Amino acid sequence: MNPDLSRLRPYPFERLARLLEDASPPDLEAINLAIGEPRHAAPEHVAARLAAHLGGLSRYPTTRGEPALRAALAAWASRRYGLVPELDPERHVLPLNGSREGLFAFAQCVIDRSARPLVLMPNPFYQIYEGAALLAGAEPWYVNPADPETPAPDFEAVPESVWKRCRLLYLCTPGNPTGTVFEPPLLQRLIERAHEYDFVIASDECYSEIYPDEARPPPGLLQAAAAMGLDDYRRCMVF
């Protein structure tokens, strides 16, 4: 048995469910802000296409995903973030069953538990970041906001001694639950530190397409790296 299992804390959604068991607002309809899932039905044209292809679901998919899917993902991300040259679907893209499995497995791949590693993450954070760090034998290090009125994590307050032990930095942009968007100058400073202190950035961008202004989509880590001329995206992983 992995002894690090004892370090895990209860999953927040389980705790939240227990807290809400007896909560019943008298004259108000409750708004569930717990798990981020759609509150409306799937679009009919999407459901129809899925149903039309159910006959092909009797076999396991390829490990790397279908070539057509990887090509479509690479083309979309290249358009979305203005990446030149475009992403290579053979080198840069791997489909996952949601971001959680990748965010967890990535930590197990890049962390050497013998080196007293730290995994940095914004606070508040998605629980999987902490769990992945603990089960990889690392210590989580929480990057707090500068003050309660400013939800952005204060990376300038991170001591150099912490950066030196950092092996993985989790980001979430746009952030959950704060909504914080990391702008390119900050992302580029973090990329520079990743190269200086020999760690990797895992940017959780699952909310990248939820934003109020169609003219200003949130920037991303790959976009920031490309603007620096780092078109190999070394030390940058996006989920």
Regions found by a protein language model. Name each.
Residues 2-101, 105:
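N-terminal small-domain helix-loop-helix segment of the aminotransferase-like
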Residues 19, 161, 229, 234-239:
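Short, intrinsically disordered, charge-balanced linker/junction segments flanking boundaries
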Residues 26, 136, 196-197:
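Helix C-cap/helix->beta junction micro-motif
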Residues 49, 189-196:
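Catalytic-core regions built around general acid/base machinery
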Residues 57-192, 208-230:
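Conserved core of the PLP fold type I
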Residues 117, 196-199, 233-234:
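A short helix->loop->beta-strand "cap" motif at the edges of active sites that frequently abuts
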Residues 168, 200, 237:
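Short, Asp-centered acidic motifs that coordinate Mg2+ and/or phosphate
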Residues 205:
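Walker B catalytic acidic pair
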